[in-house]
Amino acid sequence: MARSPASMTGQSTAFPSPIGGLNTRDSVDLLPETDAIRLDNFFPARSHVQVRNGYDDHVTGLPSTVESLMVYNSGTANTMFAASGSAVYNVTSAGSVGAAVITSLSNAQFQSVNMTTSGGSFLWICNGEDAPRHWNGSAWATPTLGSVTAANIINVEVYQERLFFVLTDSLTYGYLPVNSIAGTVASVNLGSVFSKGGKLMAISTWTRDGGSGPDDNILFFTDQGEIAMYSGTNPSDATKWGLVGVYTVGRPIGRRCMMKVGSDCYLVTENGLLPMTQVLGTGEAAPNVALSDKISNSYNDSVVEFKGTFGWQGVVYPKGGYAAVNVPSSTAGNFIQYIINLETGAWSRFTNQDGYAWAVFNSDLYFGGSTKVYKADSGTDDSGGAIEAVAKTAFIYFGGRSGPKRYTAIRPVMASDSELEVSIGFDTDFRDGTTTFTPSTTGSIASAWDTATWDSATWGSPITTHQAWFSVADIGWNAAVRVRTSTTQQSVRWLATDVRYEVGVGL
């Protein structure tokens, strides 16, 4: 029940929205007031949290699940391709899918890289079962690759003007001559370098100084959590190639376990999201080195349940200011993305985006679902459906820890670009109230939701603030606020919350 603050008594305390992000690591008794116990489909910006944008259908009518999105970047034209079923399709333009551009494939789980040589710009793709292909901006071709079974190439990276390859089910990597997209592949077995055995999963580059030069390194990752770092320009010349070190970290999850952020690269592992600047700088992967340390409990739960499911991927989205770890599920609707604000390091969780593959194309974010490619971070609904955003703040000891309080009213301060309907919940003493929409009929929302359409005040037109007091009737040492909104037509921000309470003896 919304009511005028003039009729209320007692103290009032304001605290910010949970801009510190999701925290599933620490005891609920010790969470900072800026952290959240739950933060689904809210993005923690520096000054507020906001409901994420929606997604739109981009290309429809693909034959099966889209398991790969591959982007060709050149100086003249960019193109995006999707692998679905046994074929690859051009999905650059929105609309119904056209005819396949590659057919008769064994699987649709590709890794890819862009490389520019004197012969042009190329997208080079491989899947570990079929012969690799490359696209030059106008046509696909199959490169001639000598001294290796080409179909065994399952991952690819560019380093020092060469293509480097991971070969399936082995600790062997291959590489081509400088500025080449085809030719004789030289092979190197790293079995004597790694002490835990296993197989190579991925290759990435890591630059200490942010540029190409003596500090530009190549990293080889095994499925057992070992990293071999090399530096140099020519693996066939011992005077121009050398092992820098071997490091032990968490086991990587999937082939798409690397994402590059500036000169750094992040590794998606069973132990969390690890930045190479920290891991390779310290030579170890202590728990607090993980960027995901603050969400370690929920992250670990996801690893235990889904680590064997295809679709784990790290993706960096500069336009949105965040990176995401995609966690797939065998059940539709249960996919999640752990989201980290690249500026503040705050985390949240996105849901209802069932993406098996992710890519940034022309600065926009896309994901591949079941028979469709979607454009993410677009619009205010999820392909016509509502965006369900739910948050729960930390439990805060208003007025200190010296005694219980009687809580009488709360006022979340929200902002949106149209009339806003939001549901509010209120919990005390670490209780976990209902998470269903249950409009109050008594004016009390101690363990339920109260739904109201708020009065508005101009706030940076066309954005308006929504401020209404909600009556509560509860006693406790601490309290947490829950917010839930279901929206299809508006942008929503949560700015702060006011809580009114009375401190008394013997309450």
Where are these regions (language model features)?
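A short beta-strand motif characteristic of beta-propeller blades
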Residues: 54-60, 98-103, 141-146, 188-194, ...
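Asp-box/WD-like beta-propeller blade repeats and closely related beta-sheet repeat scaffolds
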Residues: 137-160
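Hydrophobic core segments of beta-strands in well-ordered, beta-rich domains
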Residues: 81-83, 124-125, 161-166, 214-223, ...
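Surface-exposed extracellular loop regions of Gram-negative outer-membrane beta-barrel proteins
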Residues: 219-247
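Solenoidal tandem-repeat scaffolds enriched in leucines and small polar residues
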Residues: 156-213
